[in-house]
From Swiss-Prot:
Protein's recorded name: tRNA (pseudouridine(54)-N(1))-methyltransferase
Major localisation: cytoplasm
EC number: 2.1.1.257
Protein family: Belongs to the methyltransferase superfamily. TrmY family.
Role description: Specifically catalyzes the N1-methylation of pseudouridine at position 54 (Psi54) in tRNAs.
One MF annotation (Gene Ontology) recorded for this entry: S-adenosylmethionine-dependent methyltransferase activity
GO annotation, biological process: tRNA methylation
């Protein structure tokens, strides 16, 4: 199983965003839609060997974590952002009533919402995965032999904060796909294709 953890610094934590203006009213929730599509979609189906955690830190009640579990996923992911945004909207609606910090509630089969922080998610994932931080100054991906259950941490268009990077020191190995900053959706697609070829 490969895992991707995306920290979304501005993505809203309320379902009150317009499907007609995902970047503006959703705090760039459009990035999450593209990320999910790149993480899971194949030409004729979805990947069952992928798990995604997205931690949202936008207004009004951060954090919220939306978790997609490939082997259990029954919801239909389509290439368009709008239908994926509807899934996120439903998860955030159910997440409004959550009070416990780490309890997950199933929204659809394979889709969960919680109040987990970025740190909570990393700690949970590292119990059964080897962590890698995807960043421009990391070791080239071509030089790394990945274990059975790799987990990749990356940021949105704003990246990770210095505090997040300090938290990852010593627990996540830095790796890069190139020396430039790429879109998160492109990074996850590249990593999936790279691992497919191993």
């Amino acid at each position: 199983m490969r895992t991707f953890i995306l920290k979304a610094n501005t993505a809203v934590t309320s379902p009150d965003f317009s499907l007609k203006d995902l970047p503006g009213t959703g705090g760039r929730i459009d990035l999450l839609c593209r990320f999910l599509n790149s993480a899971f979609l194949l030409s004729h189906g979805i990947r069952k060997d992928v798990r995604v955690f997205m931690t949202l830190y936008g207004r009004p009640n951060p954090p919220k974590t939306i978790h997609f579990e490939g082997p259990k996923l029954k919801v239909r992911l389509n290439p368009d952002e709008r239908s994926t945004a509807l899934i996120l909207k439903k998860a955030l609606k159910i997440g409004e009533d959550l009070r416990e910090p780490t309890k997950e509630v199933e929204v659809f089969p394979g889709v969960y919402v919680s109040n987990m922080t970025f740190e909570d998610v990393v700690r949970r994932v590292m119990k059964d995965s080897t962590l890698y931080y995807l960043v421009e100054d990391g070791k080239p991906i071509t030089e790394i032999e990945f274990p059975q259950n790799p987990a990749f941490v990356l940021g949105d268009h704003l990246g990770l904060s210095k505090e997040d990077e300090r938290f990852l020191e010593g627990i996540a190995k830095k790796v890069r796909i190139g020396r430039r900053s790429y879109l998160a959706s492109h990074v996850v697609a590249f990593v999936n294709i790279w691992l497919d070829g191993m």
